């Protein structure tokens, strides 16, 4: 039986050149399937607000939302390392709230680590949370909680000034104690440089093939998202028509009296 994955295992994978697989997950049955497939890391992302709740962005997601979905995933008892996103306003206002909310995701949610968006600006927060022995994954580049400042979901680091800022962000979060860093929406060459210079694993999403690992949203790879899928997404299945066919067949059989049959009934 596979043992539970730890942050030491993830760091060892970088050292040995083994790519790290990570997907978002928000519910018990999907977590079971992912773990059976051998996923290395599961992220309960605040993307749940977009793909599950139908919000236009991640900003409305609350701590209660994140704890609820983290609990659901953890009940599947995955061997994968479970990381929970800290949602907007859960760590930006003050250090006490940041520490408390990180602790809630561990204590109430059951996560093994938390993820925080930002670089130099959140380094003190990362340091404060890791001082509580809570592992932190940093997230730099295109940070969805900052979409209004960035003018939307735009690739970051394309000019020299932005690239230097991202290099500084990567150094800052590592120095602050993050055990891994997500690189989102940045040029592949810049991600490769950050990966080579970083002592911690890099997990890419729209950051090219040189990162130590990759993460995608589960609904995107299954073809279940109604909204536009970005260039970096690869669809591994198209389940929407499969689900639609099953629902349509059910409706038709109910209307025609073909379901339930004797085999679906009790004597």
From Swiss-Prot:
This is 3-methyl-2-oxobutanoate hydroxymethyltransferase. GO terms for biological process: pantothenate biosynthetic process. Pathway: Cofactor biosynthesis; (R)-pantothenate biosynthesis; (R)-pantoate from 3-methyl-2-oxobutanoate: step 1/2. The lineage of its organism: Bacteria, Pseudomonadati, Thermodesulfobacteriota, Desulfuromonadia, Geobacterales. GO terms for cellular component: cytoplasm. Binds 1 Mg(2+) ion per subunit. Transmembrane segments: none annotated. Its EC number is 2.1.2.11.
């Amino acid at each position: 039986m596979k043992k539970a994955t730890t942050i030491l295992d993830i760091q060892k994978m970088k050292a040995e050149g083994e790519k790290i697989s990570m997907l978002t997950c928000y519910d018990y049955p999907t977590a079971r399937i992912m773990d059976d497939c051998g996923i290395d890391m599961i992220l309960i992302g605040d993307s749940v607000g977009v793909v599950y709740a139908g919000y236009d962005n991640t900003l409305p997601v609350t701590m209660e939302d994140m704890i609820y979905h983290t609990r659901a995933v953890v009940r599947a008892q995955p061997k994968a390392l479970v990381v929970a996103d800290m949602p907007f306003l859960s760590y930006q206002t003050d250090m006490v709230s940041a520490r408390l909310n990180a602790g809630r995701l561990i204590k109430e949610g059951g996560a093994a680590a938390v993820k925080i968006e930002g670089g130099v600006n959140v380094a003190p927060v990362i340091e404060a949370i890791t001082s509580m022995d809570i592992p932190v994954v940093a997230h730099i580049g295109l940070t969805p909680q900052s979409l209004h400042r960035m003018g939307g979901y735009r690739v970051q680091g394309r000019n020299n000034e932005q690239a230097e800022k991202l290099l500084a962000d990567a150094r800052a979060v590592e120095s602050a104690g993050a055990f891994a860093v997500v690189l989102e929406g940045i040029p592949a060459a810049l991600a490769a440089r950050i990966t080579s210079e970083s002592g911690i694993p890099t997990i890419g999403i729209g950051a090219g093939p040189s990162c130590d690992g990759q993460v995608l949203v589960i609904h995107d790879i299954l073809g279940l998202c109604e909204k536009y899928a970005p260039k970096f997404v690869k669809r591994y299945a198209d389940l929407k028509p499969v689900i639609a066919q099953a629902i349509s067949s059910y409706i038709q059989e109910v209307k025609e009296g073909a379901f339930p049959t004797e085999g679906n009934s009790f004597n």
